[in-house]
């Protein structure tokens, strides 16, 4: 795919058809087609990247500063982490003149197009050039990274753009990412999907840099420490529903992001029986409510990390019992431990069935990789 434009910002995108040689299409055309269907366009782009076919394009709001001047200059940019490494992208060096105006122009450009969602990737490569211990890129340093994040916060708010941050190191408990973004990735890429990527891959291991967790379940448990209503949303990456072995796994991969307050990001084309997992209105009501749950304990091995709870705006409580194990197992929660007292009517949100009343305790046998 190619992302290109004549003024330093993306105005055209290729690969809009299943054809390697499909022509570039103006974003305005894509926006119009989606609008006719009642849909909105989100883009994959970053103000840390520059796109140009015209290096002499002038940055908006500057006195003739060219977009090409934002690029790395070995003659003056001396404090780079890995100067001998090859840049994987055209990075904007944020202490170059015109960089802030370029960032503002980025958000204005998309806002003017009617694009209100931007997903920004490879942030760790900009900050220090690293994938945990592997050197990938030059790395422009924490100071330049923080400066760019401050501008993202400032101008995304000014132009009403929702910011999705991908591949950050999340240092200092995601201090700068919580400030700058609306949503943040908390685990390694879903890649081919499957329960292995969702729950088993390197389970129980936390790192100090990207990716902090190798599976989404660990990521949601660990980073629940920064989530909550009107706080940054946790993004467990895309859902390849067709990669899961059975209905139990499919219900779990939909339920956990919703219990954690995260998005449901459809990746493959759900057909036949798989479509229903994305159409459960009772589960999707959590997303509409702004619900954000928490695990009983932020523990990657103890079953308390598999029991989630939270409260809806109407005062009702949602309990999620999960089973990461290879065999059926009992999961239970003492309701008084989370401040729930009295007798409550119970309903199964996947079966769409009332289940009488509960008080004091909820307990159920959960199938392998399943939930309730």
Model regions and ranges:
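Active-site cleft segment of glycoside hydrolase catalytic domains centered on the general acid/base Glu
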Residues: 94, 126-152
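Short acidic catalytic loops
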Residues: 1, 43-45, 106-136, 163, ...
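Active-site-proximal substrate-binding groove within the catalytic cores of carbohydrate-active enzymes
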Residues: 153-352, 363-372
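Aromatic- and glycine-enriched glycan-recognition loops and surfaces
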Residues: 1-66, 97-102, 143-150
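Solvent-exposed loop/turn segments at secondary-structure junctions
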Residues: 2, 47-51, 122-127, 168-171, ...
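Active-site-adjacent "subsite" loops/lids of carbohydrate-active enzymes
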Residues: 47-113, 122-124
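Short alpha-helix capping/helix-loop boundary micro-motifs
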Residues: 357-361
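Loop/turn elements at helix/coil->beta-strand transitions in domains of secreted/extracellular proteins
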Residues: 35-42, 113-118, 157-162, 315-316
């Amino acid at each position: 795919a190619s992302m290109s434009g004549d003024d330093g910002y993306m105005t055209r995108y290729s690969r809009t058809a299943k054809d390697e040689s499909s022509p570039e299409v103006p974003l305005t055309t894509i926006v119009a087609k989606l609008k006719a269907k009642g849909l909105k366009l989100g883009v994959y782009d970053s103000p840390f990247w520059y796109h140009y076919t015209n290096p002499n394009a002038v940055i908006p709001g500057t006195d003739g500063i060219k977009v090409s001047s934002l690029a790395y200059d070995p003659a003056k940019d001396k404090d780079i982490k890995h100067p001998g490494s090859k840049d994987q992208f055209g990075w904007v060096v944020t202490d170059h003149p015109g960089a802030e105006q370029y960032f503002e122009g980025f958000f204005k450009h998309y806002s003017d197009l009617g694009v209100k969602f931007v997903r920004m990737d490879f942030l760790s490569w900009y900050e220090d050039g690293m994938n945990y211990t592997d050197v990938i890129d030059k790395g422009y340093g924490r100071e330049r990274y923080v400066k760019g994040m401050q501008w993202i916060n400032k101008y995304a708010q000014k132009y009403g753009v929702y910011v999705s941050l991908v591949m950050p190191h999340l240092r200092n408990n995601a201090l700068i990412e919580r400030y700058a973004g609306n949503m943040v990735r908390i685990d390694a890429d879903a890649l081919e999907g499957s329960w292995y990527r969702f729950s088993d891959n390197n389970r129980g291991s936390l790192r100090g840099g990207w990716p902090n967790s190798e599976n989404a379940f660990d990521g949601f448990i660990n980073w629940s420490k920064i989530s909550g209503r009107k706080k940054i949303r946790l993004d467990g990456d895309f859902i390849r529903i067709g990669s899961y072995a059975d209905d139990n796994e499919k219900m779990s991969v939909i339920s956990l992001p919703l219990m954690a307050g995260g998005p449901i990001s459809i990746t493959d084309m759900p057909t036949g029986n798989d479509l229903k997992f994305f159409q459960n209105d009772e589960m999707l009501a959590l997303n509409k409510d702004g619900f954000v749950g928490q695990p009983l304990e932020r523990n990657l091995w103890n079953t308390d990390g598999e029991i989630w709870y939270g409260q809806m705006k109407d005062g009702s409580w949602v309990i999620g019992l999960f089973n990461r194990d290879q065999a059926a197992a009992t999961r239970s929660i003492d309701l008084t431990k989370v401040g729930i007292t009295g007798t409550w009517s119970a309903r199964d949100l996947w079966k769409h069935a009332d289940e009488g009343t509960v008080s004091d305790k909820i307990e159920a046998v959960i199938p392998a990789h399943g939930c309730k």
